[in-house]
């Protein structure tokens, strides 16, 4: 894997890129004012370091970057469907599918302690570093970003290593079985993401590790809710539904 810098490079940015290359096990290549198309031609998919963020350029030239704009809008809204399902905060929450971290951020901003898992290395590197370094004047959002513990792991392996009732709530937002709408970051994450569906083995481990409930999100046409026994939370005029599996009564 290659890492290079934005065109607005200086000695400090080059030094950071070289250090990051060592950290990522990647090779640093000077930008030499090459266009992104020329970089792709020479390097294949590559990391791109800007002054304020790390991005990844896919083979189709789509750019994966961290930006909490969607989460910021949801945090400022008077109501959020996911937050309403969590119950009274603070809760300990395991987000088993971090992705772009929008849901993790919304849950953390609501006062919960969030641990977020990401199995795919490129997504983990871009998003976890964004959570740790992204600067904003929105102090609530910045506090939420810094509070999230991001861990590179597939969810099943992580769950198997946890004690019973280790988290209050488990959350999963697997890749959509249906396309919702075009979004640059969603398009960029698609070729990098883990497209695995949730399985009975995953659910059994999740039931053991979660103390209160498991929440999933999927397209309204997805049959995962019925397949795994989740109570579908219908959201009128919304293409994404949540599913909830309450556990407290089963464990009492």
Predicted features along the sequence, with ranges:
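Conserved SAM-binding loop of SAM-dependent methyltransferases across substrates and taxa
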Residues: 100-112
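Short, polar loop motifs at secondary-structure junctions
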Residues: 33, 99, 218-221
């Amino acid at each position: 894997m290659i890492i290079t810098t934005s065109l607005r490079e200086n000695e400090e940015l080059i030094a950071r890129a070289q250090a990051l290359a060592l950290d990522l096990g990647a090779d640093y290549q000077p930008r030499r004012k090459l266009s992104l198309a020329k970089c792709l031609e020479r390097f294949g998919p590559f990391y791109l370091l800007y002054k304020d963020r790390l991005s990844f350029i896919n083979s189709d030239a789509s750019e994966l970057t961290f930006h909490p704009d969607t989460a910021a809008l949801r945090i400022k809204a008077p109501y959020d469907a996911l937050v309403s399902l969590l119950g009274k905060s603070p809760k300990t929450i395991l987000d088993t599918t971090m992705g772009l971290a929008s849901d993790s951020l919304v849950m953390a901003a609501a006062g919960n302690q969030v641990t977020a898992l990401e199995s795919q290395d490129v997504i983990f590197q871009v998003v976890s570093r964004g959570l740790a370094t992204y600067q904003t004047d929105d102090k609530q959002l910045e506090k939420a970003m810094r509070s999230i513990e991001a861990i590179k792991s597939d969810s099943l392996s992580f769950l198997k290593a946890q004690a019973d009732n280790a988290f209050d709530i488990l959350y999963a937002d697997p890749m959509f079985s249906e396309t919702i709408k075009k979004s640059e970051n969603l398009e960029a994450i698609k070729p990098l993401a883990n497209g695995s569906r949730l399985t009975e083995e995953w659910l059994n481990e999740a039931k053991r590790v979660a103390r209160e409930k498991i929440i999933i999100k999927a397209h309204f046409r997805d049959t995962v809710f019925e397949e795994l026994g989740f109570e579908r939370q219908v959201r009128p005029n919304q293409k994404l539904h949540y599913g909830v599996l309450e556990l407290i009564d089963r464990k009492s």
